[in-house]
Amino acid sequence: MAVTLHTDVGDIKIELFCERTPKTCENFLALCASNYYNGCVFHRNIKGFMVQTGDPLGTGKGGTSIWGKKFEDEFSEYLKHSVRGVVSMANNGPNTNGSQFFITYGKQPHLDMKYTVFGKVIDGLETLDELEKLPVNEKTYRPLNDVHIKDITIHANPFAL
């Protein structure tokens, strides 16, 4: 399975690791299918680290899962924050996943086994480059100009056009 995030600065195609993180992918795909992420801003953007989105409030404090509550982490020794373009759930401690997620700008091994890796960017690294270049508020790391997820396309075949 794969999805394409259509953003204000371009598209990002993400392969999902449904076999290793079934609950996380079920949640993410259901939120995508219900247009939950449409209009969400990238509210946190730290050059060299990651960009975060998935909060419909746009504050970094909102968002929920399809079950209406936080859900457990799904860690795998095979899924690491080892390269640019890793997609993980954002959380505020163990087993507190909701709707927010982030995409890494590089290798981040200190995040392994703390944040559920559930996908990787397979196309659109140039869009990730554009996100990383955005000027941000130096205290909050929020982009000075909002960039949104416009909508999301779900692909059954991650290699389909």
From Swiss-Prot:
Keywords of this entry: Isomerase, Rotamase
The name this protein goes by in its record: Peptidyl-prolyl cis-trans isomerase-like 3
Gene3D superfamilies: Cyclophilin-like (2.40.100.10)
Domain of life: Eukaryota
Family under the similarity heading: Belongs to the cyclophilin-type PPIase family. PPIL3 subfamily.
Reaction(s) the record says it catalyses: [protein]-peptidylproline (omega=180) = [protein]-peptidylproline (omega=0)
Role summary: PPIases accelerate the folding of proteins. It catalyzes the cis-trans isomerization of proline imidic peptide bonds in oligopeptides.
GO MF annotations, alphabetized: peptidyl-prolyl cis-trans isomerase activity
GO cellular component: catalytic step 2 spliceosome
GO terms for biological process, alphabetical: protein folding
Ranges of residues in domain PPIase cyclophilin-type: 1-154
Organism per entry: Gallus gallus
Listed EC numbers: 5.2.1.8
Keyword Metal-binding (UniProt): no
Keyword Isomerase in record: yes
CDD domains assigned to the protein according to its UniProt record, in alphabetical order: Cyclophilin_PPIL3_like (cd01928)
PANTHER family reported in the protein's UniProt record: PEPTIDYL-PROLYL CIS-TRANS ISOMERASE-LIKE 3 (PTHR45625:SF2), PEPTIDYL-PROLYL CIS-TRANS ISOMERASE-RELATED (PTHR45625)
